[in-house]
């Protein structure tokens, strides 16, 4: 960004120098032709070169070198500055502005107390852990699952499961889970990007506009609402698997600070012969995880973050069986027909297929395994026409396993933050104490995230929410989150 701006200014100056000539230049016969050609070449080439540098050695962000992959220091701004000084400085400025204006606004004891009351917590306790202590009310699964698996699918969106797109067959695993397990499609991700959504799982807190993965847990204590902490209290060893690089967003250190015993990623996988700049193929990731699961002897919780359904969409999905011609013939007017779009659809199909294969095979190995499947976000697919908010921003949520009632989530609406308490309700005997900021899904009829809400079966933007009570609850949850970020517990 800074490079492009500098080149524009430089080119503008050159243009002025060419057009506004001194009188003595005329007397001397004007600038020589080759000088003008050099100036013209600079005017044309420098902006192109600046754009090439701006996107990490390409003319589009999907094809360039991601700054995460070029990380060489412990500091995000310095890593990004290797490829783009302007973008790095802009990110630092915006983060600082958010921190000063919203997240780090002073919160009084009285304001925090009112927020706790609004969310149904106990204001008389001396900690938020105790304030939001809950007792499981649901009947636990007849058999405690030895393995619990949460799959957070990269861009695993709701839209391929909507009636107008279902005939494309891009989410056959989702359709199967819909029939075999419990599900809700009235569901929201915690954010509009992978890290903001992942922060919700790893802290149990709603998004407040900060990258808390760099700040929380540094004092040695995990968030009591974190999914890793919740599962550890339920007696599980906690393991995080990521299909990308460990340097991305300081993910390894953050997961280990927030309740996970182990962290594994793509650099532990055998050579695949193909990869993208974003990570290893989901199929290879699932294969390695299944092998590890077969060797486990203790109760273990696996959190899996996939990567294949992400730019640059470079896998040979046709070789993996993607029915390109059939899908193209069925495309509705709202989906473009260019090759890049069809390639992206192929990656949606591939990620869904290998996830389904993994679930079925693990289920054969251990029938007691409990699965949760959802997407980290939607909002990454470019439709050709305007579509509904459900198609643009919705993600599905499935619970599948031995003894899970198919009507478990009937009528429910919720978000990522409510998966951890739902697991506690399913696994722990009635009356067991657990900690959660929000209600479990089976007790929830509405939801919110950073900008959207679901109420009475409808989705909308928060700025249009007229329910004052619901608005108050949303702000109360964010107040608790801001306070925890400030205190870092």
Predicted segments with their positions:
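Solvent-exposed soluble domains appended to multi-pass membrane proteins
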Residues: 120-489
């Amino acid at each position: 960004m800074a490079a492009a701006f500098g080149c524009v200014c430089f080119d503008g100056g050159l243009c002025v120098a060419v057009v506004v000539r001194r009188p003595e230049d005329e007397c001397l016969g004007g600038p020589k032709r080759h000088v003008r050609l050099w100036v013209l070449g600079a005017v044309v080439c420098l902006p192109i070169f600046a754009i090439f540098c701006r996107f990490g050695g390409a003319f589009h962000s999907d094809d360039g070198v991601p700054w995460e992959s070029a990380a060489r220091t412990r500091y995000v701004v310095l890593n990004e500055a290797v490829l783009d000084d302007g973008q790095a400085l802009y990110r630092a400025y915006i983060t600082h502005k958010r921190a000063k204006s919203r997240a780090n606004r002073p919160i009084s004891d009285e304001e925090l107390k009112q927020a706790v009351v609004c969310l149904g917590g106990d204001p008389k306790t001396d900690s938020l852990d105790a304030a939001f202590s809950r007792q499981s009310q649901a009947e636990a699964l007849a058999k405690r699952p030895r393995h619990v698996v949460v799959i957070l699918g990269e861009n695993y969106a709701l839209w391929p499961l909507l009636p107008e797109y279902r005939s494309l067959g891009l989410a056959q695993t989702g359709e199967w889970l819909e029939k075999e397990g419990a599900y809700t499609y009235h569901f929201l991700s915690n954010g509009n990007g992978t890290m903001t959504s992942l922060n919700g799982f790893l802290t149990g807190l709603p998004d407040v506009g900060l990258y808390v993965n760099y700040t929380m847990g540094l004092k040695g204590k995990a968030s009591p609402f974190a999914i890793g902490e919740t599962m550890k209290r339920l007696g599980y060893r906690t393991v995080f698997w990521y299909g990308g690089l460990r340097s991305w967003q300081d993910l390894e250190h953050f997961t280990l600070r927030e309740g996970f015993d182990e962290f594994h990623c793509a650099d532990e996988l055998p050579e695949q012969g193909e990869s993208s700049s974003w990570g290893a193929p989901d199929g290879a990731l699932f294969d390695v995880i299944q092998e590890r699961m077969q060797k486990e002897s203790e109760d273990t919780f696996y959190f899996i973050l996939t990567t294949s359904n992400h730019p640059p969409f470079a896998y040979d999905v046709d070789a993996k069986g993607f029915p390109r011609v059939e899908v193209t013939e069925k495309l509705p007017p709202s989906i473009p027909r260019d090759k890049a779009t069809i390639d992206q659809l192929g990656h949606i199909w591939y990620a869904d297929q290998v996830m389904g294969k993994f679930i079925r095979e693990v289920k054969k190995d251990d029938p007691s395994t409990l699965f949760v499947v959802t997407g980290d976000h939607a909002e990454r697919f470019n439709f050709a026409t305007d579509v509904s908010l459900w198609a643009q921003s919705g993600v599905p949520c499935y619970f599948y396993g031995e003894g899970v009632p198919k009507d478990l989530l009937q009528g429910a609406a919720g978000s990522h933050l409510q998966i951890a308490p739902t697991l506690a309700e399913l696994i722990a005997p009635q009356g067991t104490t657990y900690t959660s900021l929000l209600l479990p899904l089976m007790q929830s009829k509405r939801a919110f995230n950073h900008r959207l809400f679901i109420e009475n079966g409808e989705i909308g933007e928060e700025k249009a929410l007229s329910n004052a009570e619901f608005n108050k609850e949303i702000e109360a949850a964010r107040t608790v989150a801001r306070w925890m970020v400030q205190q870092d517990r």
